[in-house]
Amino acid sequence: MVSRRFAVVLLCSALGGIGCQGRASGATPKEGPMLLAVGAKVPNLTGTDQHGAEHRLADSTGHPLLVYFYPKDATPGCTKDACAFRDVWKRFEQQGVTLYGVSRDDQASHAKFAAKYQLPFPLIADPSGAWEHAFGVPNNNGKSTRVSFLFDARGRLAHVYPKVDPGVHAEQVLGDVARLGSGQ
């Protein structure tokens, strides 16, 4: 009887130790997507903007490309970010940057948002999450996480911005684009 009780205690201890060992190692039951890594090629994606025009990312090589993901049209942070890009749009054009905003909102929502805030760049409708998935952008309750990707003229990912501050993001990207042009 004692040996049987000892065996049960020993078994429970061993099983409990396995569970503790898994937690101690930092393992999580569900890992999120991995963001596209610096050096990766531009994903081969096509999307429709707020005007119904088709855009192929693969056609965007030869000059810098910024793809920025945002959660939802016309929300405070997303509006601030989009308007900051709008306000420095001429500088993006002067540096030859192609810029795409991407969210899961549909084309009609993008059209309304772009018209209201006079956004001069394409907003790609990604209701299926295909772009989000290709870039490894986490999804939070049906909304893309705010993250941006800057590609160089060769179509290689040069910078990932996983923690975007809408108040400074546009200027930060312009600085990085200037450094790309100078080879830094």
Where are these regions (language model features)?
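Bacterial N-terminal signal peptides that target proteins for export
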Residues: 1-8
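Thiol-/selenol-based redox modules, centered on thioredoxin-like
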Residues: 144-184
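Structural microenvironment flanking redox-active thiols in thiol-disulfide oxidoreductases
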Residues: 79-117, 128-133
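N-proximal helix/coil linker or "cap" segments that precede and/or mark the start of modular domains
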Residues: 19-44
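A short beta-strand-turn-helix
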Residues: 45-65
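Short loop/turn microsegments at loop-to-beta-strand junctions
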Residues: 42-43, 64, 145-147
